[in-house]
Amino acid sequence: MGKAFSQLTSQKDEDKSILPDNPAMASKAANYFSTGNRKPSHSCVPCEKAASTSFVTCPTCQGNGEIPQELEKQLVALIPYGDQRLKPRRTKLSVFLAVTICLLIFSLTIFFLYPRNIVVHPVGLNSSTVAFDETHVQLNMTNVLNITNSNFYPVTVTQLTAEVLHQTSVVGQVTSSLRLHIGPLASKQMPYEVASRILDENTYKICTWPKIRVHHILVNIQGALTCSYLTHPQQLPFESFEYVDCRENMSMPHLELPRPA
């Protein structure tokens, strides 16, 4: 007898609604609960609107039903496991495309920004002027450098330093600031002038003695160019040996050399 009474009381407690005693909301929420083995034919049944209650669209009914706004934070929406919203579309394809694009951009950036050689090649002596006094030879030479930029970005030549050596003695020096721009994959020729003063007695005789037919002397030109690219400075050394006629002025114009392949 007591057992039957206990079961009856338990059944009454289960049938008791957990919602507030509002007739409009109770009738509204009744459509979203099932007891025992009862199975609704639809995931959400359209509900009748009450005049004094505001409603929000049921998230699982695809817009076909409504729930009381007061119960929006109390009711739980159930969606099938096979619902398309639980299966992100083309996730693998999107990730693959994103990774591929990032790798492609990274590879292209490395390819175009990777520093390549900047070649400085002395073309030779372009012209020279000679002057004498009683003890020394004043020799002014104009030389030409060919600069080749193998990078995919421009470079700027900012400084030139050079010195002239004759018989291991420094006879002339020059330092000058420049602003020579060289485009990507381009070559330019740059002339520069060095004034030299030779005090060697034997050299003076070679240059001034009229009985000597050949008045050439050998000078060694050493120098360096300072280039800047992508805010990075770089020094490029060069060296050349030139035979100079120290008896009279001469001019040997050099045409621009083609860029080496």
From Swiss-Prot:
Main localization (coarse): membrane
Location(s) in or outside the cell: Cell membrane
Organism superkingdom: Eukaryota
Membrane-spanning ranges: 93-113
GO biological process: glycoprotein biosynthetic process; innate immune response; macrophage activation; positive regulation of canonical NF-kappaB signal transduction; positive regulation of interleukin-1 beta production; positive regulation of interleukin-6 production; positive regulation of MAPK cascade; positive regulation of MHC class II biosynthetic process
Region (Disordered): 1-22
Membrane topology: Single-pass membrane protein
Record has Cell membrane as a keyword: yes
Biased composition (Polar residues): 1-10
Record's keyword annotation contains Membrane: yes
Alphabetized UniProt keyword annotations: Cell membrane, Immunity, Innate immunity, Membrane, Transmembrane, Transmembrane helix
Protein name: Transmembrane protein 106A
Gene source species: Rattus norvegicus
